[in-house]
């Protein structure tokens, strides 16, 4: 689509008829552009929020192909090469994300997968429990096995260095500390790994969801920092959820779950997360970096 738009813009805003188009040919190009824009719109509209990261990755790949076609149209080799690189890397990223979210590339292309399904009548909504930093410190001080589950909120708050400091304090206190990283946590595969590596978190502490899930029932405290959909237990238990079938980090199996969030908002999929109202879950509202830094200060003061 972007390539066709480039051709149209080039033909109308340079010389009178640079490509030798007759009026009917120009109308044909305009009609094709309108059809392709409509096709792109109707392809994306049915997609559920839980599958949107895969769609965005796929559209990134298509944008690279569009740039490559535009390069062919204007005989620009640099644009062709860069467009092909973007298209190829975007396609590889799409395949990785499809696998991580338990989707197939065929369903991505030919089905409106992930559409919202109607849910049955629900009971009265439970309110999540909240806790102060001081009370959270008392629980962490007694914990011997702690797992961090980072998400996009950690990236937004730039809390990775504060998380490393808290990790060090917990280890000094005798706790075993690990990180359970979902493959699509953040905005691309490896996003959390890069941030934690920047903060000098040891590589051996960075575990995949598949590695940590069998051990989650033995974890004293799971600290969810800015993650939402990737810890939503509905992906396992609720067939009516648009997230159903997506692998998650089983944070809900830990003895205690701390969820660090700014507010009660939903994740990228737009669906509610029952983890937040579980009996073993407490919310610690506020900026993730400030909250983690406050926990570090509690350890330092005590």
Model region roles, listed by residue range:
Residues 124-302:
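Structured cytosolic domains appended to multi-pass membrane proteins
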Residues 5, 37, 112-124, 150, ...:
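Gly-rich Lys/Arg/Thr-decorated short loops/hinges at beta-loop-alpha junctions or inter-strand turns
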Residues 39-52, 94-98:
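C-terminal ends of transmembrane helices
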Residues 22-35:
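Structural signature of hydrophobic alpha-helical transmembrane segments
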Residues 85-143:
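Membrane-interfacial segments at transmembrane helix termini in multi-pass membrane proteins
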Residues 30-32, 74-89:
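Loop-to-transmembrane alpha-helix initiation sites
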Residues 46-65, 76-77, 85, 105:
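Short, non-helical or kinked segments that cap or interrupt transmembrane helices
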């Amino acid at each position: 689509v972007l390539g066709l738009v480039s051709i149209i813009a080039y033909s109308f805003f340079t010389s009178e008829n640079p490509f030798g188009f007759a009026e009917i040919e120009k109308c044909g190009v305009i009609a094709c552009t309108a059809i392709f824009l409509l096709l792109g719109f109707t392809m994306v509209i049915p997609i559920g929020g839980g599958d949107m990261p895969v769609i965005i990755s796929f559209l990134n790949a298509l944008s690279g192909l569009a740039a490559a076609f535009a390069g062919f149209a204007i005989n620009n080799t640099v644009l062709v090469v860069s467009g092909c690189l973007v298209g190829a890397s975007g396609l590889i990223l799409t395949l990785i994300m499809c696998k991580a979210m338990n989707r197939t590339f065929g369903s991505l292309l030919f089905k409106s997968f992930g559409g919202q399904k109607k849910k049955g009548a629900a009971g009265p909504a439970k309110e999540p429990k909240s806790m102060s930093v001081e009370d959270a410190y008392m629980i962490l001080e007694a914990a011997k096995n702690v797992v961090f589950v980072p998400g996009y909120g950690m990236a937004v708050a730039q809390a990775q260095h504060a998380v490393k400091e808290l990790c060090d304090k917990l280890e000094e206190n005798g706790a075993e500390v690990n990180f359970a990283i979902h493959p699509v946590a953040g905005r691309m595969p490896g996003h959390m790994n890069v941030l934690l590596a920047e903060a000098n978190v040891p590589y051996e502490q960075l575990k995949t969801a598949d590695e940590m899930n069998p051990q989650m029932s033995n974890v004293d405290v799971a600290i969810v920092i800015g993650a939402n959909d990737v810890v939503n237990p509905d992906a396992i238990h609720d067939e009516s959820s648009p997230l159903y079938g997506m692998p998650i980090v089983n944070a809900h199996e830990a003895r205690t779950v701390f969820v660090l969030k700014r507010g009660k908002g939903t994740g990228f999929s737009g669906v509610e997360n029952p983890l937040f109202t579980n009996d073993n879950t407490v919310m610690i509202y506020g900026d993730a970096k400030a909250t983690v830094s406050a926990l570090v200060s509690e350890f330092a003061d005590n």
